[in-house]
């Protein structure tokens, strides 16, 4: 058995549902009413992604950055 570590993005939508994704795999998303529930679901999705894809052909995760965007406000 081998253990891997993958980056995970956690978001909270307008309905209070946690959406989690692993940017290393395309389409690797899950959701839940708690973060733990969402992460448990994502773990299963990641396992399926590993079974279907070679780990050599996955996206290389670089990082997450915050970006400032200024928009004009009309009077």
Regions found by a protein language model. Name each.
Residues 1-6, 40-75:
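Short, charged, surface-exposed hinge/linker loops at domain edges
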Residues 26-35:
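A short, exposed loop/beta-hairpin motif centered on an aromatic-Gly-Thr core
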């Amino acid at each position: 058995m081998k253990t891997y570590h993958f980056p995970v993005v956690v978001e909270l939508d307008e309905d209070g549902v946690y959406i989690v994704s692993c940017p290393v795999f395309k389409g690797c998303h899950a959701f839940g009413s708690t973060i733990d529930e969402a992460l448990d679901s994502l773990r299963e999705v990641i396992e399926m992604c590993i079974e279907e894809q070679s780990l050599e052909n996955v996206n290389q995760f670089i990082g997450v950055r915050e970006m400032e965007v200024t928009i004009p406000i009309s009077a």
